[in-house]
Design a protein with these regions (language model features):
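Post-HEXXH active-site segment of zinc metalloproteases
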Residues: 84-100
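Conserved small/polar residues in nucleotide/adenosyl-binding loops
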Residues: 105-107
Length: 107
């Protein structure tokens, strides 16, 4: 997954963390486009599979993990890293916005 994306900016405040991520040209925007990489992320952060997932098919992230946007995967990884480090506090979900340029993501 080296060279997949660049983190342009990270802003941390008391109640949230925001990241601006640019997916490099030619890299997959959907998890289904690189299922091996998606599986590697799962093996590194297996707890994301059981995350509640609102607005997608199924109830848990595992229900859509193999066919979702890369930004959605990064959102769940971010929430889980915050949980594992104790920085999440009351945060239990994330929000992702894709700009007019599909490769620029705001998590």
């Amino acid at each position: 997954m080296a060279g997949l994306f660049n983190i342009l900016k990270v802003t941390v405040s008391e109640d949230k963390i925001c990241a601006h991520v640019l997916v490099n040209p030619g890299m997959p925007l959907m998890t289904s486009e690189d299922i091996e990489a998606t599986a590697r992320v799962y093996y590194l952060v297996p707890a994301i599979a059981k995350h509640l997932c609102l607005g997608d098919s199924g109830r848990e992230f595992q229900d859509c993990m193999g066919q979702t946007e890369l930004c959605h995967l990064l959102e769940h990884v971010t929430v889980e890293l915050m949980n594992e480090t104790g920085l999440a506090g009351s945060i239990s979900c994330g929000r992702t916005r894709v700009s007019e340029h599909l490769s620029l993501i705001h998590i």
